[in-house]
Amino acid sequence: NSNAGTLLLFDVNNIRYVSATKIGEWERDKMCRFCLLTGDDSPYVWDFGSAAEHHKRHSDWLEPSHCLAGVVGMRGTIPPEFGLMQKYAKQIAQLIKDAGMADMPVGVDYAETAMFHALQEEGLNVVDGQQIMLAAREIKNTDEIQLLTQAAAMVDGVYHMIYEELKPGIRENDIVALSNKMLYEMGSDDVEAINAISGERCNPHPHNFTDRLIRPGDQAFFDILQSYQGYRTCYYRTFNVGRATPSQNDAYVKAREWIDASIAMIKPGVSTDKVAEVWPTAESLGFANEDQAFGLQFGHGLGLALHERPIISRAVSMDHPMEIQTGMVFALETYCPATDGYSAARIEEEVVVTETGCEVISLFPAEDLPIANRY
């Protein structure tokens, strides 16, 4: 639905989506590859040195002459005055002209500032290409849903391991290490992050892990962010260690009620503001405004990126609702602080939107508060 004739992509997720190519995960934040899709032509990929020859030999869905070596700025480590940005901006502009797209906008997802300037100096009308790509990636096909389901199944297994290992004497970082090991052994291509939060660290939510020792009676929650064949998980579970207090259990029950209420709302045609409405306000949880509570009661698309569309939050959805559609895959997450002032419960479910509702694909049991190594 865009009016762009060309897409120039530096985001590794967009490059993968358009060209079906990927090199090592180390590339993610380097801005060392780029891809051009112009008119009806097949994609061009400028790769990191010899990776171009590798893709030429092994990526038979690409035109061999479109597998090129090239680099621009690598996040500024190659200064603009070296001239590489101008060199490739000229090459890109010529390819766009050859494809008959010179008079149409060029969607760029993101690039270094100097690269934007170089493209504009070549007379290109640069527009926001990230919105075009995110719209294209909103609806998942059958293969994508299968990969997302497989990724979630891997995390099911990790949570069973955590349920067995979570006991006094083990540290948050030990759980992170064990989880990384298990995921890579199962075939994960990237463990993006694992949050491990326990005891007094549960409130406020710090979004990290430390070397804190687990103690009897701790409430602890974890988030596992990893990908299988590029497709990602965001999947929280809360446990108690040995036993739970009434305050901790009450927090869990509320978090479960909130997430169940949001899952019940999911079906094609429902707008995201209606989902966000069933969650508590920031003020009811002790925050001054929704910005301070952002991400605690939250929904976000899953795919090649951790955060895709739709985004569901009281901070944005009430004024800017989006329509839920069949084929979307997203995570719903809730958070409830306990009345003891430091414990908290966090639950997250991944759902696939079907023609009549949704299917939950995060299957480690979470209907009731799991007690690990019960006394």
Residue ranges and their predicted role:
Residues 1-375:
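Active-site neighborhoods and metal-handling regions in enzymes and metal-associated proteins
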